[in-house]
Amino acid sequence: MKQLSSAEVRQLFLDFFKEKGHTIEPSAPLVPNNDPTILWINSGVATMKKYFDGSVIPDNPRMANAQKSIRTNDIENVGKTARHHTFFEMLGNFSIGDYFKEGAIVFAWEFLTSPKWIGFDPDKLYVTVYPEDEEAKTIWREKIGLSEEHIVEIEDNFWDIGIGPSGPDSEIFYDRGPTFGDDTSDPELYPGGENERYLEIWNLVFSQFNHNPDGTYTPLPKQNIDTGMGLERMVSIIQDAPTNFETDLFMPIIREVEQIAGVKYGHNQENDVAFKVIADHIRTVAFAIGDGALPSNEGRGYILRRLLRRAVRYAKVLTINEPFMYKLVPVVGKIMNSFYPEVENQTDFIQKVIRTEEERFHETLNEGLAILETILKTAKETNEQVIKGADIFKLYDTFGFPVELTEEYAEDHGLKVDHAGFEAEMKEQRDRARSARADVKSMQVQGELLANLTAKSEFVGYNATEHVSEILYIIQDDALVDEVASGKTAQVIFKETPFYAESGGQVADKGTIESETGLAYVEDVQKAPNKQNLHRISVKEGVLKTGDTVKLAVDKVKRRETIKNHTATHLLHRALKDTLGEHVNQAGSLVSPDRLRFDFSHFGQITEEELTKMEEIVNEKIWEQINVVIEEMPIAEAKELGAMALFGEKYGDVVRVVQVGKYSIELCGGVHVRNTADIGLFKIVSETGIGAGTRRIEAVTGKEAYRFVTEQENTLKHTANLLKATTKEAPQKVEQLQADLREVKRENESLLSKLASAASADIFESPEEIGGVKVIAKQVNAKDMNQLRQFVDNWKDKKIGGILVLGAVQGEKVNLISAVSEDAIKAGYHAGKLLKEVATKCGGNGGGRPDMAQAGGKNPAELATALDYVSTCVKEQQA
């Protein structure tokens, strides 16, 4: 067997399929682009769904990739098994309506057994097949020459993820020999069984059926191939490693952790689990942050936070009690740099994010652990088997403990956790967290009509807004028709069109279609599978027919305003990077006639000064009257120019480059102004956070910017008039009013304090004596909880001692407060427990510390009853 590094195995795979006529697709970012069905790219095929369901026709039906992936449905097993990972690489080859079973099987066998490639001993390889897949069995037996003993029928060998393409599959296994299992009585010791001897290395999926919504299966219009080879497994065989973790993908990380911890790997099972957890999780977190995800309490951000905190928990096993994960980022970058330069290129930013997250967790970890230990100890002392949901929620909400982390600690003590109770406390957050356990979701059912419309349609709208063309196709109700009449809607493809199809954030053009016999409006334009512009139209007069010569006219006003916003978006993108840092990546955009919206990745808040700076930069570029140059060039040349690519997009060999002087260079298929002066004016309307690590700027240009400024100016004038000041004097006048208001509030608080003190003389006079304990339970006039606290302060100052409970009516609700002196606490009284009981008598609840608590109620009419109940509670406790 050849001795190969992981980088060499990856490259051999891609070189092999390139030689076989496949286009090598770049690895997509882990954060899905325009696919809301999954949190992460979790397989090689996840980026190919649009080809498999026929919504897009690829330029080359043969494709291959090495795709970084994240799966989080088995986090608890990572580190405890030989091959569970949260981050992994999937090598795959794909055929969309080209070669099928024989081609896929022959390619796989050649790559695995040819001395030119991997060079495995054929006798070491076994395959599994679906029992009813006679075609695959015949190919393995007759074309490849495998004996019956090396072909195993497995009922589960059928790939089906719900509605969409499905079909049988064939898995290839490598026999690692009797060292990894030789018990002939073991019912799982066979290829496809649960054992360490026969290791699955490649899965060949033969997509030949549509799984229809009604549950039936029908043959696909185009049969497809989808294969997946786990790089980590493959490398473990080639490098003769007992588990994936002893390969060159993980060992450099483990060695670095050894240096940090002063503990050796391979000498203690508990320590080794910790090493593996850390090595796996840092790969996931580093790549995910590099691809635009950031730690948070929801969605994919919750997964990152959970992984980081799980790694920190395991680091304690290795006596690492300080932030350290960030130190491993350069190691990950170095291991993967030959194919994935993104981690090494963003090391500083990724380290900053991880270190900040670690420091935050360490601030609360020890306190949280102390509370958890108390909870676990109490549970054991009281013979409880389950940790309460309320306790789990407190650890999560206050100390940032993921419920899974609490569960792992509980399991270590032989206890379970109350998941249902926790979910009742925090249903929304748990729902979002559970959504992270999604796998590849159903694709659309593969359709034929649009995929079979192959006539070319040319977009001529870069240089024209009007054009005479011919109708090629009219589609109504998913069928080709010859004509569409007044009052009806349809989809139309023209031989040439000036109408821009929605893409890259730019909205579709609208406009009119005129022929000798009819008039229609274009309401939307989208891309068809074969890249034609597909126009959704409504016919207003007469009839339109296939073959008609028509005049197409784009709405010039809307187009003009749209392109101003599009070029301004490019300028803003560059200004964001210049102001905030190169880590900023586009996360989405909308370019419409009336505004632009730009979503981007950024860790932290944006200051007013930064927003002002960005706005100034964009306007300076507008006023510099820079020509916008657009040209097509090879992608390699565009990269040499430093062109920015849209994060997550895939590009062909020739790309369209939009250059705004030397300031902004981007790959873009949209329509733009000829000179930045055409934009006129740029104003930022708002800046907000829309999710973990994602922020949004909305802005306007041209007439809309003028309108926005005018509205702001009118608002300022109106405010100045109310203040009886000029617009220049208005800010100073507002500051003075604020100062006056603060002084009035201060004086008011002072008066209220004096009133409370005066009222206290009556309230605190002659407290009730119950078993030697002074008890005061009275209703007072207090507008809010702050005033009630002032009464408590006065009670403490007078050193009356005992128990105090006060209530006040505030509108339709009740405020309650209680206090217990130190000697009463020693006697067993607890302010929080007492007030919790009292509050129930007026429709409320609450609680607090032994010395002080507060509560609310919903029934003011029962306040007197609640206060009378205080004496009863004290007497019951003394009984």
Swiss-Prot record:
Family annotation (InterPro entries): aa-tRNA-synth_II/BPL/LPL, Ala-tRNA-lgiase_IIc, Ala-tRNA-ligase_IIc_anticod-bd, Ala-tRNA-synth_IIc_core, Ala-tRNA-synth_IIc_N, Ala-tRNA_ligase, Ala_tRNA_ligase_euk/bac, DHHA1_dom
Annotated protein name in UniProt: Alanine--tRNA ligase
Keywords (A to Z) from UniProt: Aminoacyl-tRNA synthetase, ATP-binding, Cytoplasm, Ligase, Metal-binding, Nucleotide-binding, Protein biosynthesis, RNA-binding, tRNA-binding, Zinc
UniProt binding sites for Zn(2+): 566, 570, 668, 672
CC cofactor note: Binds 1 zinc ion per subunit.
Source organism of this protein record: Listeria welshimeri serovar 6b (strain ATCC 35897 / DSM 20650 / CCUG 15529 / CIP 8149 / NCTC 11857 / SLCC 5334 / V8)
Protein family according to the UniProt entry: Belongs to the class-II aminoacyl-tRNA synthetase family.
Reactions performed catalytically: tRNA(Ala) + L-alanine + ATP = L-alanyl-tRNA(Ala) + AMP + diphosphate
One GO BP annotation of this record: alanyl-tRNA aminoacylation
NCBIfam families in alphabetical order: alaS
Localization, UniProt: Cytoplasm
Superkingdom assignment: Bacteria
Required co-factors: Zn(2+)
GO CC annotation, single: cytosol
Recorded GO MF terms: alanine-tRNA ligase activity; aminoacyl-tRNA deacylase activity; ATP binding; catalytic activity, acting on a protein; transferase activity; tRNA binding; zinc ion binding
UniProt-listed Pfam families: DHHA1 (PF02272), tRNA-synt_2c (PF01411), tRNA_SAD (PF07973)
Record EC number: 6.1.1.7
Summary of the function given for this chain in its UniProt record: Catalyzes the attachment of alanine to tRNA(Ala) in a two-step reaction: alanine is first activated by ATP to form Ala-AMP and then transferred to the acceptor end of tRNA(Ala). Also edits incorrectly charged Ser-tRNA(Ala) and Gly-tRNA(Ala) via its editing domain.
Record comment regarding domains: Consists of three domains; the N-terminal catalytic domain, the editing domain and the C-terminal C-Ala domain. The editing domain removes incorrectly charged amino acids, while the C-Ala domain, along with tRNA(Ala), serves as a bridge to cooperatively bring together the editing and aminoacylation centers thus stimulating deacylation of misacylated tRNAs.
